[in-house]
From Swiss-Prot:
Keywords: ATP-binding, Coiled coil, Microtubule, Motor protein, Nucleotide-binding. ATP binds at G87, Q88, T89, G90, A91, G92, K93, T94. This is Kinesin-like protein KIN-1. Disruption phenotype: Partial seed abortion due to defects in megagametogenesis. Defects in pollen viability. The gene is KIN1.
């Protein structure tokens, strides 16, 4: 059982931070490649030790080779992997993930995403195994708590499903087969052009959504007739924001609230996973946000996972940086037990007993069809499915997931309705008090009793109906 790989990366100070007359210091003092001393805005000092610390002079290649390369290699061999960039807005997350751009970018500035794509296809082409590889690409963003397909904008509210054999799935998401890195990067560019961005006082091109790049790598072995499937997910999180620093208002402020809420949900999941001894009875609130639901497999342990905590080195942002580092330290305690997803190929899975059973069912249905109407046949097939005589494990798992989603949404809707009613009751009570005070001033005691009786009867009738 291994822990999550957690690294910190300090970007160079911005021109604004360099010009600031009140504070011109940096908040991190290096000790070695894994440890540094952090000084907060109150000048209190904390020592942090992580798997690796990338200081201001670090290169994109160094981050890739330590953080992403091992996970990418395992994904090609059937072990799921997840790489996440986390930090406040303007801390360098998108630069670390993409670089200045994922196409036509010099080698020095290439981000994790283009390096992973190139490395993945290089490993596939140099593989000594006699196998056929299939790579599929999907790309989604979580914007205002809706999952949008960035490769097909008509799919603006992708549903998240759970399958007992395949884990978390995005129902109906576009999956594009890609044969080489050039083709993959072209599709990624198309998706990135559709991502929601906006301008704030801290970032001229601030991501207004969480973005996930999903690669499914299937390896069909010719020799032993086995199929390995690895999922590789790269997640560029939107940054946590403080409205007084970003100057956000209107739509941008609402986006920031939603972003902060989902990041808070992520923190709650990590707290639940790392607080105290684990047991089957522990509730992990994966369903509190779309982000945590999509990351459920990674956070739950069936994936290698790496977290890059992107930080500002300036004392101007010391409180936000401290929060980011503490988040990383908590995530470091998540336990992971990733396992290779390997099954026999469809032909190898066929067994005489199952074939015989299917043939018998088929012959019975054919005989019955000879003497029954189409309507009767349809009804009988429905009964067979309902009674479990003929059924699909995948469809049954999907039904369970849909049921759970409906229950969760119903509870949320009811809670919202109760909250709204409570607000109305408070408003009516306030109005009642005002009327009572006015009546007392006007010496009209009868009106006080009438309004009190009206409020009481309305309140009672609602909760008894």
């Amino acid at each position: 059982m291994s822990n999550v790989t957690v690294c910190a990366r300090f970007r160079p100070r911005s021109s604004k931070e360099m010009r600031d007359p009140s504070r011109d210091g940096v908040c991190a003092r290096p000790i070695d490649a894994e440890t540094f001393v952090f000084q907060d805005d109150k000048e209190d000092e904390f020592t942090f030790s992580l798997d690796r610390v990338f200081y201001e002079d670090s290169t994109q290649a160094a981050v890739y080779e330590f953080l992403a390369l091992p996970i990418m290699r395992d994904a090609v061999n059937g072990i799921n992997g997840t790489i996440i960039t986390y930090g406040q807005t303007g801390a360098g997350k998108t630069y670390s993930m993409e670089g200045p751009g994922i196409q036509d970018c010099d080698e020095h500035n290439k981000g994790l995403l283009p390096r992973v794509v190139h490395g993945m296809f290089e490993q596939i082409s140099s593989s000594n195994d006699i196998a056929r590889y299939t790579v599929k690409l999907s790309m989604v963003e979580i914007y205002m708590e809706k999952v949008r397909d960035l490769l097909d904008l008509s799919k603006a509210n992708i549903q998240i499903k759970e399958n007992k054999t395949q884990g978390i799935l995005l129902s109906g998401v576009t999956e594009v087969p890609v044969s080489d890195s050039v083709e993959a990067l072209q599709h990624l560019c198309t998706g990135l052009a559709n991502r929601a961005v906006g301008e704030t006082q801290m970032n001229m091109s601030s991501s207004r959504s969480h973005c996930a790049y999903l690669f499914t790598i299937q390896q069909d072995s010719v020799k032993d007739k086995r199929v390995k499937t690895g999922k590789l997910i790269l997640v560029d999180l939107a940054g946590s924001e403080k409205a007084d620093k970003t100057g956000a208002e209107g739509r941008v402020l609402e986006e920031a609230k939603t972003i902060n809420k989902s990041l808070s949900a992520l923190g709650n999941v990590i707290n639940a996973l790392t607080s105290g001894p684990s047991s089957k009875g522990n509730h992990i609130p994966y369903r509190d946000s779309k982000l945590t639901r999509i990351l459920q497999d990674a956070l739950g342990g069936n994936s290698r996972m790496a977290l890059l905590c992107c930080c500002s080195p300036s004392t101007l942002n010391a409180s936000e940086t401290l929060s980011t580092l503490r988040f990383g330290m908590r995530a470091k305690h998540i336990k992971a037990s990733p396992r290779a997803s390997e099954v026999k190929s469809a032909k190898a899975q066929e067994e005489p007993s199952s074939v015989t059973k299917d043939e018998k069912c088929g012959r019975i249905l054919e005989k019955m069809k000879e003497r029954m109407s189409n309507e009767d046949i349809k009804m009988l097939e429905d009964v067979f499915i309902q009674e479990g005589i003929i059924f699909s494990l995948d469809s049954m798992a999907e039904v369970e997931t849909v049921y759970e989603d409906i229950v969760s949404k119903t509870i949320q809707s009811l809670q919202q309705a109760v909250d709204e009613l409570q607000q109305k009751v408070k408003k009516l009570e306030a109005e009642n008090i005002g009327i009572q005070e006015q009546a007392l001033r006007n010496h009209e005691p009868g009106s006080v009793g009438k309004m009190s009786r009206f409020i009481s009867s309305w309140y009672a009738s609602f909760f008894t109906s």
